[in-house]
Amino acid sequence: MTQNTAIPMVDLRAHFAPLRDEILTGIGKILDDASFILGNQGRALEAEVAGLSGVAHGVGCASGTDALMLALRALEIGPGDEVIVPTFTFIATAEAVLYVGATPVFVDVDDRFYAMTIAGIEAAITPRTKAIIPVHLYGLPADMPGIMALAQKHGLRVIEDCAQAIGAQINGQGVGSFGDIGCFSFFPSKNLGAAGDGGMVVTADAELERKLRGLRNHGSWQTYHHDVLGYNSRLDEMQAVILRAEFPHLAAYNDGRRRAAGWYAEHLVGLDLQLPEAPAGYHHVFHQFTIQLNARDAVKTALHAEGIASAIYYPIPGHQQKMFAHQAQTHCPVAEHLAERVLSLPMFPELREEQIARIATVIRRTLHG
């Protein structure tokens, strides 16, 4: 490794440094007020995230995974039902389907935009299908207009997995507002990240909001009255105050990511690799900057030798995970090919062009041998 400073995948120290005093003041006030669960900070954040998405209601919860599970429960999806999910994404999407007793049906993805195709979804629909969960992978929205038209045609519910895409849009419409319910994650490395776990569900439907609020709180809509089996899944005030300190800067954070993506495109031009793309009208927020290349492993090794982080999202598609070995084998050739080619490079708003130039130099040197 050279004497150059290491470049991480995400620099949370740099991210939180300008907000430190504001966050500590907010945490001190929470300690003074001794209001830790379901308080004013959480309610304010719910309104802010719902407003960003363009819907009326937000319901905070303990994680993005819980957000998906709560959404499925609110839509009364359970044993005997099938839910269509992409195979090329984080396991939580399919995991949530299992948690409610339903069956995830894996669908292959497009190799340009990393999302399920309309044709692929339609081919997977059976009489048992109840919902579709499109994932806005890496910060790029899935084809929501097409998915919503297909869902309407077949009478299906739609849950958007927005974990990686807060602030992303299609023709000015925010993710989370297309489907019946949108689900967000506040894992620390996300575009809007907490100092721990957290999540949120958003919806335009007041009845779904009512269901979600009870389900996240032990199935209770009135203290000590428990109408259904629920969960202990609440976004605490400490995380909410941290997220609210960041929230006014989210657009700037996403702009910083898009700026870094532009620098990557400039410095990686002409190399034997595939850069991220976005359809016209799609606002990509670059949770990850993911390239495709045949020499993926060699490049990853070379970057590591120079103290530069990189990651493979994702090395094993969902349909090939051991936990689904009991299901009928699904063939998803695009996802299987992507798992051998994708490489995510450092991506965070504070990334500097000279850092990206250094990353590109290592990649160029490796590919040109």
Swiss-Prot record:
CDD domains: AHBA_syn (cd00616). One of its GO terms (cellular component) is membrane. The keyword Lipid biosynthesis applies. The modification N6-(pyridoxal phosphate)lysine is found at residue 190. Pfam families: DegT_DnrJ_EryC1. It is an enzyme of class 2 (transferase). Its EC number is 2.6.1.122. Keywords: Aminotransferase, Lipid A biosynthesis, Lipid biosynthesis, Lipid metabolism, Pyridoxal phosphate, Transferase. One of its GO terms (molecular function) is pyridoxal phosphate binding. One of its GO terms (biological process) is polysaccharide biosynthetic process. SUPFAM superfamilies: PLP-dependent transferases. Gene3D superfamilies: Aspartate Aminotransferase, domain 1, Type I PLP-dependent aspartate aminotransferase-like (Major domain). Aminotranferase involved in the synthesis of 2,3-diamino-2,3-dideoxy-D-glucopyranose (GlcN3N), which is a component of lipid A in some species. Catalyzes the amination of UDP-2-acetamido-3-dehydro-2-deoxy-alpha-D-glucopyranose (UDP-3-oxo-GlcNAc) to UDP-2-acetamido-3-amino-2,3-dideoxy-alpha-D-glucopyranose (UDP-GlcNAc3N), using L-glutamate as the amine donor. Other amine donors, such as alanine and glutamine, can substitute for glutamate, but product formation is slower. Belongs to the DegT/DnrJ/EryC1 family. This is UDP-N-acetyl-3-dehydro-alpha-D-glucosamine 3-aminotranferase. The gene is gnnB.
